[in-house]
């Protein structure tokens, strides 16, 4: 089945900005997160699609390659694999690997080196609150992974059983065949790539040397992380074959939406409602921050939509020590559920202001613009 266009997966056009991509990813990842859609295979598949699309479009180099070549940029033989080679220890071989496949072995190896396969990289998606993302936290997680077999300690053989070098591939785990000027290489059908023959395979792991296990880990999440950030836990992935190194675990961060604050990079935004009398006369109000409340002075004649910046009350960057700002947007509330006396007072206030344009500069400016518009319209 052909892969969907990554821009289409995130609901974006090809020319979308980095912020557009990030916002779309946050929204969709939160909507389709497995924790919110337990048991839904459709949501799980959609979540995987969204993450795959963001891994490419969220990286400038990968996005450029995708824009030029499409999905072909990431197929075997070209392009880049997610997380430095992709989940599964695959990716692209180096110069030596290419020559090994073509001419029968690494430089100076003689083609008899036992195959060493690093363990798979694993991915774990975790959802945290905005407070946890801003201040940092520790999270206990439980993952399922391939671990070294406790019974045979990774050998794949029962205790006392013989483990011999495979006579078919001489321990390399690969079979080479020459066809004219070319040499092809394939996994040894006798030992299935292990390079060894076991007399009595371990009953616990069936000769693989690894078993599926649940593992508990404590993850330290640094302050300042955001949705899409990845934490690499070296060696916490699946165990490798034949004693090879384990892969890595990548913990992918998802920050839940907050009831009060919205985050954009290092800055936090919130809307603060004030009464129309406070807006007209000025005063002092309390505004929330992630560290508690603080006082904010509202000058007289404040209009709705005015922004107030509280420096240093945003998010501290994990790369530096720089803290962003809290930006409060004032929203002037219209009074509701008025009694007759209150309505009369407002009517009297309106009458006292009606003939004086200086009291309503925005309205007068708007009316002047409308008059000019229609005046110019009649000249054409």
UniProtKB/Swiss-Prot annotation:
Its cofactor is Zn(2+). Residues 5-70 form the J domain. CXXCXGXG motif repeats lie at residues 149-156, 166-173, 188-195, 202-209. Pfam families: DnaJ, DnaJ_C, DnaJ_CXXCXGXG. Belongs to the DnaJ family. This is Chaperone protein DnaJ. A zinc finger (CR-type) spans 136-214. The gene is dnaJ. It is found in: Cytoplasm. PANTHER family: CHAPERONE PROTEIN DNAJ (PTHR43096:SF48), DNAJ HOMOLOG 1, MITOCHONDRIAL-RELATED (PTHR43096). The keyword Coiled coil does not apply. Participates actively in the response to hyperosmotic and heat shock by preventing the aggregation of stress-denatured proteins and by disaggregating proteins, also in an autonomous, DnaK-independent fashion. Unfolded proteins bind initially to DnaJ; upon interaction with the DnaJ-bound protein, DnaK hydrolyzes its bound ATP, resulting in the formation of a stable complex. GrpE releases ADP from DnaK; ATP binding to DnaK triggers the release of the substrate protein, thus completing the reaction cycle. Zn(2+) 2 binds at residues 166, 169, 188, 191. GO terms for molecular function: ATP binding; heat shock protein binding; unfolded protein binding; zinc ion binding. GO terms for biological process: chaperone cofactor-dependent protein refolding; DNA replication; protein refolding; response to heat. One of its GO terms (cellular component) is cytoplasm. Binds 2 Zn(2+) ions per monomer. SUPFAM superfamilies: Chaperone J-domain (SSF46565), DnaJ/Hsp40 cysteine-rich domain (SSF57938), HSP40/DnaJ peptide-binding domain (SSF49493). The J domain is necessary and sufficient to stimulate DnaK ATPase activity. Zinc center 1 plays an important role in the autonomous, DnaK-independent chaperone activity of DnaJ. Zinc center 2 is essential for interaction with DnaK and for DnaJ activity. It comes from the Bacteria.
């Amino acid at each position: 089945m052909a892969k969907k266009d990554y821009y289409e997966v995130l609901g974006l056009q090809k020319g979308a900005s980095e912020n557009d991509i990030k916002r779309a990813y946050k929204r969709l990842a939160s909507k389709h997160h497995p924790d919110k859609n337990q048991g839904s295979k459709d949501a799980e598949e959609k979540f995987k699609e969204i993450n795959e699309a963001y891994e490419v479009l969220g990286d400038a180099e990968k996005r450029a390659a995708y824009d030029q070549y499409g999905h072909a940029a990431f197929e075997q033989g070209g392009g880049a694999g997610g997380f430095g080679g992709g989940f599964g220890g695959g990716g692209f071989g180096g110069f030596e690997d290419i020559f090994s496949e073509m001419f029968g072995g690494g430089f100076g190896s003689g083609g008899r080196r036992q195959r060493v396969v690093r363990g798979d990289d694993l991915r774990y998606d975790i959802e945290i609150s905005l407070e946890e993302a801003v201040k940092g936290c520790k999270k206990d997680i439980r993952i399922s992974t391939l671990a070294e077999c406790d019974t045979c300690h990774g050998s794949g053989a029962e205790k006392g059983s013989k483990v011999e070098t495979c006579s078919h591939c001489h321990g390399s785990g690969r079979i080479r065949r020459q066809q004219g000027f070319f040499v092809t290489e394939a996994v040894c059908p006798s030992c299935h790539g292990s390079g060894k023959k076991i007399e009595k395979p371990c009953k616990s792991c069936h000769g693989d040397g690894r078993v599926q296990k649940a593992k508990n880990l404590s993850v330290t999440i640094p302050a300042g992380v955001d949705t899409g950030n990845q934490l690499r836990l070296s060696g916490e992935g699946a165990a490798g074959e034949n004693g090879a190194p384990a892969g890595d675990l990548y913990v992918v961060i998802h920050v839940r939406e907050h009831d009060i604050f919205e985050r954009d990079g290092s800055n936090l935004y919130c809307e603060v409602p004030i009464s129309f009398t406070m807006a007209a006369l000025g005063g002092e109000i309390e505004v929330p921050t992630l560290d508690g409340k603080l006082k904010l002075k509202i000058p007289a004649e404040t209009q709705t939509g005015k922004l107030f910046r509280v420096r240093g009350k945003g998010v501290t960057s994990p790369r530096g020590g720089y803290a962003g700002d809290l930006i409060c947007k004032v929203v002037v509330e219209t009074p509701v559920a008025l009694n007759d006396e209150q309505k009369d007072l407002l009517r009297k206030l309106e009458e006292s202001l009606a003939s004086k344009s200086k009291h309503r500069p925005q309205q007068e400016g708007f009316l002047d613009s409308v008059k000019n518009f229609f005046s110019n319209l009649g000249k054409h």
